[in-house]
Amino acid sequence: MDFLDIAGKNFLVFGVANKKSIAFAVGEVLSEAEAKVVYSVRSAARKESVSKFLPDADIFLCDVEREYEIKELAENISKKYPKIHGIVHSIAFANYEGGLKPFHETRKKDFLQSVDISCYSLVAIANAFKDLLDKKASVVTISISATKMAAEPYGFMAPVKAALDSTICFLAKSFSSFSEIRFNSVNPGLLKTSASAGIPGYLDYYLFAEQLTLRKKALTTKEVANTVAFLLSERASGINAQRIAIDCGMSVNYFDKDIITKATRV
């Protein structure tokens, strides 16, 4: 028996954009374990592009900014899948048009739109799918490791992700009144994804983060996906309302002697 024991179970994955997406890597790991993976993307154009590299996948449409579409998605999926055993929420958006600005110059509409798409969407999805989820299902969202640091390349996305981390605690508590459904976040360090490529100056931070890892090798999306798959399985039944950091030890290595030498020697 496969360790994860998820063969034949149904999982809904939000947020796949291309082969560099965390959502894509999660789908691969779940499929390798013989689970059924269902995808949700935000537009017909995205569905068309995703279908090119996932030709046999069952792909649904849902723009999470429109709450009625989330409800329609649950209804449409329920017609084909009587139970969903897990949901992966890999959705985030921040409008960096015009480049990164000092945090205090963040526009209200940009901040609130980011909260709506990146954070509130999880609440709306959980509510819409509560009757379709198996009573021991698992919901995993993708956050970031740097919500407590003023990491400039993330801009206002960091406090939005901090709100997301808090949200899982309240969802876990709320759902505990009628189920054993678990909510957790996976909080990776810096990754090479298409989304991160759009962040001004991100590459320099990514290369610096790689030097800070204990192994001196950057984190991969496959490593993040493996952790997500574990949390989705009942092997992780004791883990609920938790923030799981995956950063290859970066967060304990800020005083690495090689980094210090480079910074203090001219």
Report each predicted region and the residues it spans:
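Canonical Rossmann dinucleotide-binding motif of NAD(H)/NADP(H)-dependent dehydrogenases/reductases
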Residues: 3-40
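Catalytic loop of short-chain dehydrogenase/reductase
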Residues: 15-24, 92-131, 135-178, 187-192, ...
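Conserved mid-core segment of classical short-chain dehydrogenase/reductases
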Residues: 62, 66-71, 75, 79-80, ...
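Short, small/polar-rich loop/turn modules that mediate ligand/substrate recognition or access, typified
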Residues: 177-182, 239-241
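Conserved SDR Rossmann-fold cofactor-binding beta-strand/turn motif
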Residues: 182-192, 232, 245-247
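A short C-terminal helix-loop "cap" of Rossmann-like NAD(P)-dependent dehydrogenase/epimerase domains
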Residues: 199-213, 262-265
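A conserved structural motif in NAD(P)-dependent oxidoreductases
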Residues: 213-224
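Short C-terminal tail/terminal secondary-structure segment
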Residues: 240-266
